[in-house]
C-alpha cells in the first residue's frame, strides 16, 4: 500500500481539528501523521490507527511524546473511549472500478469508507465526544445522512471549502443527546 501524501483535504481538516481540545483523541487512518501532530498539541494523549503497517512505521519516528500508534482497521482493536475522533477517510467514488488506490478510493459511491469508519468510531466515542471528518460533494452524502439518523447521531457542518472540481465539507458528528 502506498502512503497517502497530505493534500488540500488533509490541511483543511487539520486546520479545523486544531480548535478542539481535551483528554484523549484518536485519529483513524493516520497516514503521514499531520493531523495527529495537530491533535497532540491540544490533547493529553493521542492515538493513531492505520490499517497499513508501513504507514505507521514511516510516521513512528515523528510520533509525539503523548502519542501511540496501533495497526488495525479503523478503531477495531481499541477498547478505551475518546473525547475526540478525527479521520480523513478516502472519499472519491470508484463507480467505474478502475481506481485501486485505497488511500483515495472511498468505495462505489465514495462514502463507504466513511460509513465504515463511523460505525467503528462510535463504539469508542465518549457520550459527549465529537467526531470530525471530511466529505466531498462528489460522494453520495445521502447515505451518510441515513446512517446518522439510524444511529441516533447528529451532524453539523463546521466549514466548507470550494475547489475547482468539488466542494469539501468538514462535518462534526456526535450523539444526539439532550
Task: Write out the residue ranges for each language-model feature.
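C-terminal lobe and adjacent flexible extensions of AdoMet/dcAdoMet transferase-like proteins
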Residues: 171-178
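Mobile active-site "lid"/loop adjacent to the S-adenosyl-L-methionine
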Residues: 89-116
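Conserved SAM/SAH cofactor-binding pocket of Class I
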Residues: 8-87, 93-94
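Class I SAM-dependent methyltransferase Rossmann-like catalytic core
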Residues: 1-6
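Short amphipathic alpha-helical segments
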Residues: 60-61, 97-100, 144-146
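Glycine-rich, phosphate-binding/catalytic loops in enzymes
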Residues: 42, 101-104, 149-150
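Active-site-adjacent beta-strand anchor residues
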Residues: 29, 49, 107, 133-134
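Conserved Class I SAM-dependent methyltransferase catalytic core
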Residues: 15, 113-170
Amino acid at each position: 500500500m502506498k502512503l497517502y501524501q497530505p493534500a488540500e483535504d488533509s490541511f483543511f481538516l487539520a486546520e479545523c481539528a486544531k480548535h478542539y481540545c481535551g483528554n484523549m483523541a484518536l485519529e483513524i487512518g493516520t497516514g503521514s501523521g499531520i493531523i495527529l501532530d495537530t491533535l497532540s498539541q491540544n490533547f493529553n494523549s493521542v492515538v493513531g490507527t492505520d490499517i497499513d503497517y508501513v504507514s505507521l512505521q514511516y510516521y513512528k519516528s515523528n510520533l509525539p511524546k503523548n502519542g501511540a500508534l496501533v495497526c488495525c482497521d479503523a478503531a477495531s482493536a481499541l477498547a478505551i473511549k475518546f473525547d475526540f475522533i478525527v479521520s480523513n477517510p478516502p472519499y472519491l467514488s470508484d463507480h467505474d472500478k478502475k481506481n485501486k488506490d485505497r488511500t483515495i478510493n472511498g468505495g462505489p459511491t465514495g462514502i463507504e469508507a466513511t460509513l465504515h469508519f463511523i460505525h467503528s468510531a462510535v463504539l469508542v466515542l465518549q457520550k459527549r465526544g465529537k467526531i470530525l471528518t471530511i466529505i466531498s460533494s462528489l460522494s453520495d452524502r445521502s447515505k451518510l445522512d441515513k446512517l446518522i439518523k439510524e444511529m441516533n447521531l447528529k451532524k453539523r457542518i463546521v466549514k466548507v471549502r470550494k475547489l475547482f472540481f468539488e466542494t469539501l465539507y468538514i462535518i462534526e458528528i456526535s450523539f444526539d443527546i439532550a
